[in-house]
Amino acid sequence: MTYRKTDEEVSKLTPEQYRVTQQNGTERPFTGEYTDNKRPGIYVDIVSGEPLFASADKFDSGCGWPSFTKPIVPANVNELRDNSHGMIRTEVRSAHGDSHLGHVFPDGPQDRGGLRYCINSAALRFIPREEMEAEGYGGYFNQVEDI
């Protein structure tokens, strides 16, 4: 499968999805569609469709945004230094879609690598396990579990 950002896909974004992914915005905490999602499946870039995170790596951090311990395909996630808002953080962007996803912090579960990928729901599209094969993501079944 080829993943890329197209003008057509960008034009389909809601105003909030555009603000978050194309203008480096952040959702208000506890407002995102996937914050409390516990269904098995994968999360892909809303623009390019590239696989980003799996339900098996999602955890409740209490921060108000979906949190994951690691990307499903590390090469699909770029990490960049972010000096905005008077802080030094690590921004997370999709590699093919160049969408702003959120940030990664070193305060995740220690027994699962110690990282917390804090991701905006507006940057994601959830593919339920039962639809993964039909949508072309069947190769990721081994990274999805009931949570």
UniProtKB/Swiss-Prot annotation:
Family matches, as InterPro entries: Met_Sox_Rdtase_MsrB, Met_Sox_Rdtase_MsrB_dom, Mss4-like_sf
Active site: C118
GO annotation, cellular component aspect: cytoplasm
GO molecular-function term, one example from the UniProt record: peptide-methionine (R)-S-oxide reductase activity
EC numbers for this chain: 1.8.4.12
Keyword rRNA-binding belongs to the record: no
An individual GO BP term: response to oxidative stress
Alphabetic keyword roster: Oxidoreductase, Plasmid
Reactions mediated catalytically: L-methionyl-[protein] + [thioredoxin]-disulfide + H2O = L-methionyl-(R)-S-oxide-[protein] + [thioredoxin]-dithiol
The organism's place on the tree of life at top rank: Bacteria
All residue ranges annotated as the MsrB domain in the record: 6-129
Pfam annotation, one family: SelR
Matching PANTHER family: METHIONINE SULFOXIDE REDUCTASE, PEPTIDE METHIONINE SULFOXIDE REDUCTASE MSRA_MSRB
Family from the record: Belongs to the MsrB Met sulfoxide reductase family.
Protein's name according to its UniProt entry: Peptide methionine sulfoxide reductase MsrB 2
Protein source organism: Rhizobium meliloti (strain 1021) (Ensifer meliloti)
